[in-house]
Regions:
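Flexible glycine-rich beta->alpha loop in the catalytic core of nucleotide-sugar glycosyltransferases
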Residues: 107-109, 125, 131-134, 150
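Conserved acidic donor-binding segment of nucleotide-sugar-dependent glycosyltransferases
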Residues: 142-150, 158-163
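Glycosyltransferase donor-binding loop in the core domain
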Residues: 27-30, 111, 144, 178
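Acidic donor-binding loop of glycosyltransferase active sites
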Residues: 97-111, 124-125
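Conserved catalytic-core segment of nucleotide-activated headgroup transferases in glycan assembly
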Residues: 1-77, 82-91, 97
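Short hydrophobic beta-strand element within catalytic cores of glycosyltransferases
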Residues: 115-119, 125-128
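Short acidic/histidine- and often glycine-rich active-site loop of Leloir-type glycosyltransferases
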Residues: 130-144
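A charged, aromatic-enriched C-terminal amphipathic alpha-helix characteristic of glycosyltransferases
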Residues: 164-191
């Protein structure tokens, strides 16, 4: 992954940003597993914790091609899960710019996850698993990594309400993407 152009206007107004976003094609089984796991084991904990604290829980927005019936069935009236399915590049850019947190709850899969690099490029604060962070250098600079459902949920709840930390993570993504995924960074690797 190498980028030549970078975001010119990072939306750091987290007071106006809302929702949890997942992006991934559902022809790839790890993505379906991730959304099902998040929807069944993590998202209910987030809703419970936030409602208990008198907060309105965020919507969980799912974007990706080839949505299965099992994934589509997750969206029910008033449960906060929105299955958007396939969206255009423009719509996806808008979702990245307006969501508060990107979640990548992968439990299996191999290699660098394009969805993680894409979310970093788009300035999104990201919570993922160890699997989701595989192959990402200096992962601790831009990703929050949690593997257990309760820890993942608690991290979402804590980060979601911390606008300063959200802004800080978003700013770090832009430094990070230039350091690790720019043409200059690629040339540095080749020279080594």
């Amino acid at each position: 992954y190498v980028y030549e152009d970078f975001l010119q206007n990072l939306n750091k107004d987290f007071a106006k940003r809302e929702g949890l976003l997942f992006v991934g094609g559902f022809a790839h089984p790890p993505n379906a597993d991730a959304v099902l796991w998040f929807a069944k084991d993590i998202y209910p904990r987030i809703r419970q914790k936030m409602e208990a604290a008198g907060q309105i829980p965020p919507e969980f927005i799912v974007v990706g091609s080839k949505v299965t019936d099992e994934i589509r069935a997750l969206q029910q009236p008033d449960n906060g899960i929105i299955i958007k399915g396939f969206v255009s590049e423009e719509e996806l850019s808008e979702l990245y710019a307006t969501c508060r947190v990107v979640v990548v709850p992968l439990r299996y899969g191999a290699g660098v996850k394009g969805k993680v690099v894409e979310a970093i490029y788009n300035g999104a604060p990201i919570i993922t698993t160890s699997v989701g962070s595989e192959g990402i250098p200096d992962v601790e600079k831009v990703l929050l990594v949690k593997d257990q459902p309760d820890e993942f949920a608690e991290t979402v709840v804590e980060l979601y309400k911390d606008e300063k930390r959200l802004e800080d993570l978003a700013e770090k993504t832009q430094v990070y993407i230039r350091e690790h995924f720019s043409i200059d960074a690629a040339w540095d690797v080749i020279k080594e």
